[in-house]
C-alpha cells in the first residue's frame, strides 16, 4: 500500500479595485499516493492579466510557487521545485505536481489580479 498524501486545495477570492475576481479551484481536496502526478486547476471569470499559485504550510505564511503575467508568460516564485505550470488561455492556470512527495502536502491557493 502506497503512502498517501493529502493536498488541501482551498478556494481563494481576491478583490481587484472595486470588483472581485471570481476564482474557481478544483479539485477542492485531493488525496494521492507519492509518485503520482497531480494537476490542480485554476479558472478565473475576469480577464485579469496576472495569475498566481501559492502554498501555505503549517506554521508558515503564503509562499509563491509560480505566477503568470499573461497567457504563455509564466515565471518561478519562491518555491517552484517539483511543480510545472502552463497558461495557454487567459482564464486558466493549471498547476501540476510532477511526482507528488510528502513535502508537497500543503494548502494551495490560486489568485488573479489586473
UniProtKB/Swiss-Prot annotation:
Coiled coil: none annotated. Its main location: membrane. The gene is TRBV10-2. Alpha-beta TR is a heterodimer composed of an alpha and beta chain; disulfide-linked. The alpha-beta TR is associated with the transmembrane signaling CD3 coreceptor proteins to form the TR-CD3 (TcR or TCR). The assembly of alpha-beta TR heterodimers with CD3 occurs in the endoplasmic reticulum where a single alpha-beta TR heterodimer associates with one CD3D-CD3E heterodimer, one CD3G-CD3E heterodimer and one CD247 homodimer forming a stable octameric structure. CD3D-CD3E and CD3G-CD3E heterodimers preferentially associate with TR alpha and TR beta chains, respectively. The keyword Cytoplasm does not apply. Residues 1-21 form the signal peptide. This is T cell receptor beta variable 10-2. Disulfide bonds join 42-110. V region of the variable domain of T cell receptor (TR) beta chain that participates in the antigen recognition. Alpha-beta T cell receptors are antigen specific receptors which are essential to the immune response and are present on the cell surface of T lymphocytes. Recognize peptide-major histocompatibility (MH) (pMH) complexes that are displayed by antigen presenting cells (APC), a prerequisite for efficient T cell adaptive immunity against pathogens.
Amino acid at each position: 500500500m502506497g503512502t498517501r498524501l493529502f493536498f488541501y486545495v482551498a478556494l481563494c477570492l481576491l478583490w481587484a479595485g472595486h470588483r472581485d475576481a471570481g476564482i474557481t479551484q478544483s479539485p477542492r481536496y485531493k488525496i494521492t499516493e507519492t509518485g503520482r502526478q497531480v494537476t490542480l486547476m485554476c479558472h478565473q471569470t475576469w480577464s485579469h492579466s496576472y495569475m498566481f499559485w501559492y502554498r501555505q504550510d503549517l506554521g508558515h505564511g503564503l509562499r509563491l510557487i509560480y505566477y503568470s503575467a499573461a497567457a504563455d508568460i509564466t515565471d518561478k516564485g519562491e518555491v517552484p521545485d517539483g511543480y510545472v505550470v502552463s497558461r495557454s488561455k487567459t482564464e486558466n492556470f493549471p498547476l501540476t505536481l510532477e511526482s507528488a512527495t510528502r513535502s508537497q502536502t500543503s494548502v494551495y491557493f490560486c489568485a488573479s489580479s489586473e
